[in-house]
């Protein structure tokens, strides 16, 4: 049985982290060995990069291109140290964010050069793409309200303007339209149970082929 790479994507507060955990529990109950990881922060080096990237904007401002390069560095380390070796061992990996986040946030959100972003993604991933990406689609105001309700303070990205987050959301919509077989949209504003069931229904046919 070969390894599989499933990514969860979406704007802030879309519920992807909770849904990824529920998905992992479901797969484990089916007897599948699962690894949960995230970007940024999927390695020891990545933990340090995550702290730099998400600290509040007023603490230490980060230039937009610097931000892009730090995300690429995190991804390169993650792919080399964790993703490729674990997939080669036949593991199922569930990842909270991957290359589509960079396209949506730094490409659409920051309006950085898409050719540069694709080049950096190609270098960082070495061609590794997800088998399936679950895009949890929620209205940006709903997602940010959820984050504020957590009472833990907003990080540097979450503090961005509504206009920024709307551009990110449009980026995800465009990505899903251009890669419909890889990126599957799920309505993230439905109940947690309904979203989880929908994800099960999406993945079940693939599991029959993979197992």
UniProtKB/Swiss-Prot annotation:
Catalysed reaction, written as an equation: dTMP + ATP = dTDP + ADP
Top-level taxon: Bacteria
Entry-linked Gene3D superfamilies: P-loop containing nucleotide triphosphate hydrolases
One Gene Ontology term, aspect cellular component: cytosol
The enzyme's E.C. designation: 2.7.4.9
GO biological process, one term: dUDP biosynthetic process
MF terms (GO), sorted A to Z: ATP binding; dTMP kinase activity
Keywords: ATP-binding, Kinase, Nucleotide biosynthesis, Nucleotide-binding, Transferase
Matching InterPro entries: P-loop_NTPase (IPR027417), Thymidylate_kin-like_dom (IPR039430), Thymidylate_kin_CS (IPR018095), Thymidylate_kinase (IPR018094)
Record: residues binding ATP: 10-17
Entry-linked SUPFAM superfamilies: P-loop containing nucleoside triphosphate hydrolases (SSF52540)
Annotated function: Phosphorylation of dTMP to form dTDP in both de novo and salvage pathways of dTTP synthesis.
NCBIfam families: DTMP_kinase (TIGR00041)
Family of the protein in this entry: Belongs to the thymidylate kinase family.
Stated name of the protein: Thymidylate kinase
Gene behind this protein: tmk
